[in-house]
Amino acid sequence: AIASLAEQFHSTVVLCTATQPSLDDLLRTYAPGCPATELCPRTAALYDKFRRVRFRQAGTLTDEALAEELSGMEQVLCIVNSRKAAQAVFTRLPKEGGFHLSTLMIPAQRQALLGEIRQRLIDGLPCRVVSTSLIEAGVDVDFPAVYRELAGLDSVLQAAGRCNREGKRPPEESLVTVF
């Protein structure tokens, strides 16, 4: 269909996405004869620049096991799929440096907590945050480790964007754990 569009209507087709896979094989198979031109120069260098984390699959974790892992870390973000799950994990964490974010909070309360969280991250103080997916988009925080309950790839990648966001740590020290 793409090849027909380009050929019959003398069109240029632009394919773009935030997480673009290699298109060479797809174009060779489904759009033979359609030349592909990379619009973004030096993509290999860009991939290297944005390779800031490594991923780990932890399998299924109980609330207790998850809270135990989180408690062993000084600074960590944990994103779960429901408010109920967030509350269940949060109540098992040490009180010092523990934060719970939910859409049930009024925006001003969330903003105040996010300000405190950012400051603790900067100061190197304990900061263990349990949140729903509200923190995945539009929230600028940088954790050394992120735990993400299994969700769609887009959600996992958004969560990964909260780990080593500023690129100050090597990827080997910036772990995104999917459970």
Q: What is the meaning of each model-derived region?
A:
Residues 9-11, 48-53, 96-97, 141-144, ...:
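Short glycine-/polar-rich loops that comprise or flank the Walker A/P-loop
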Residues 71-94:
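Conserved strand-helix element at the start of the C-terminal RecA-like helicase core
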Residues 13, 19-23, 59-62, 83-86, ...:
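Conserved nucleotide-binding/hydrolysis micro-motifs of P-loop NTPases
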Residues 121-136, 148:
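Conserved two-lobed SF2 helicase motor
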